[in-house]
Amino acid sequence: MTASRRAPETVLVTGGGGFLGAAVAGRLAARGDRVFSFSRGEHPRLAGLGVEHIRGDIADAGALERACRGVEVVYHTAAKPPPWGPLSDYRRTNVTGTAMVIAACRRAGVKRLVHTSTPSVLFSGRDLEGVDESTPYPPRWHSPYAATKAAAEQQVLQAAAAGLPAIVLRPHEIWGPGDPHFVPRILARAHRLRRIGDGNNLIDTTYIDNAAQAHLLAADRLGENPG
């Protein structure tokens, strides 16, 4: 299957009102797919992107199953982000929510699942360089976000091993036009952040267009090679 010959698909983006979710949904709509967004809030800007919005809770099994009916690909970008909140909130959204998405995909016969994770699942407080998907998880995690995202991606990988065509992506510190978090935080704290190390420390970041396109390419490749 080539990009020029691919048939339009019906897809669902969880967390479609978020920074990454909206970018993924917009790109999908722009290439001709029928796109549904699933999230708790109202997001009028999605209509301008050609996206149909379904309002629902990520931990609501019935709502998710209804949203997945007739859908071929699910992009699961919804998550509770760091850094604040009780562990129970992270578990509900990131762990229970992902379990509900997987179950809905199975019941509705969804063909492919693309799950957004994070490199934080590998972070143990030490520098990470040259890591890949074979790098093992740390003995413990330093935040509820990392711990619950690790549990979530393990659920997806287990579902994939059991036959659901699924893939996990780990973009880091996504930024770009419309960024509500990364760059604004840096600018707001300019000259007030504590310096760590000798000033030569590196951090990987992901531009929003690249992150969104990676999700589309992952789904397309998964369609070519479900195994």
Predicted regions and their residues:
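Alpha-helical substrate-binding/gating segment
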Residues: 187-193, 203-227
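N-terminal Rossmann NAD(P)H-binding glycine-rich loop of SDR-like oxidoreductase domains
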Residues: 10-31
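Conserved Rossmann-fold NAD(P)-dependent oxidoreductase catalytic core, especially the SDR/UDP-sugar
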Residues: 96-145, 167
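Active-site segment of SDR-like NAD(P)-dependent oxidoreductases
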Residues: 80-81, 119-123, 135, 172-175, ...
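Active-site Tyr-X1-5-Lys
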Residues: 140-167
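Glycine/proline-rich active-site loop of Rossmann-fold NAD(P)-dependent oxidoreductases
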Residues: 150, 164, 175-185, 217-227
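NAD(P)H-binding glycine-rich loop region in Rossmannoid oxidoreductase-like domains
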Residues: 45, 51, 55-96, 104, ...
